[in-house]
Amino acid sequence: MAEAIIPAAELSIKTLQNIVEGITGVDRKIAIGFKNLTDYTLENLGVYFNSGSSDRSIAYKINAQEALLFSARKSDHTARGTVGTFSYYIQDEDKTVHVMWSVPFDYNLYSNWWNIAVVDGRQPPDSNVHDNLYNGSGGMPYPNKPDQYINNEQKGFHLFGSMTNNGQATIEVELKKA
């Protein structure tokens, strides 16, 4: 599945389930839908992978009222899942929105984990940003377990989202101006 941009109104959990089911050959994978329900264009700052990869590059921008479709998977022949962070810059507001996911290889030791945050300035994803999102440190909100909704305001934006709890995970996130 190529990463794509679709109208935000067309994003559904079924769309994400179809994407994740289309990733073959691995048991740990994720499809993420990110709705930009603001009046701003979001500029991609990159993707950081702690483990795993994506078969496609992430979209350069997400226009107002559009949704990003992104997928990632564990790397072949490794005992690790897919764990990473992608970030988009909200130029008109000089803020960055980060989305972090973790779909572990070993559910005896770990569980799915995710987070979203809006921060001041232009902040590309890297190991420090990812670790702060994963651990709820460095001023980042505490991460969420699957099946727990995020519904809060950060830096003038309303964030809403959820993650499913299995090795074929989905995350659906909405960003709105507060």
UniProtKB/Swiss-Prot annotation:
- Keyword annotations: Cytolysis, Hemolysis, Stress response
Query: What's known about how it's activated or inhibited?
Result: Inhibited by sphingomyelin.
Source species, domain of life? Eukaryota
Q: Which positions are annotated as binding phosphocholine?
A: S51, V83, S102, P104, Y134
tRNA processing recorded as keyword: no
Gene3D superfamilies membership: Cytolysin/lectin
- Any idea which GO molecular function terms this record carries? channel activity
Asked if the Swiss-Prot or TrEMBL record annotates the protein with the keyword Zinc, the reply is no
Question: What do we know about what induces or represses this protein's expression?
Answer: Strongly up-regulated by abscisic acid, osmotic stress and drought, up-regulated by wounding, jasmonic acid or salicylic acid and not induced by salt, cold or auxins.
Which family does the entry's similarity section mention? Belongs to the actinoporin family. Plant subfamily.
Q: Relate the protein's function as given in its record.
A: Actinoporin-related protein having hemolytic activity in vitro. Binds probably a phosphocholine derivative with the unique amido or hydroxyl groups found in sphingomyelin. Involved in drought tolerance.
Q: What protein am I looking at? A: Bryoporin
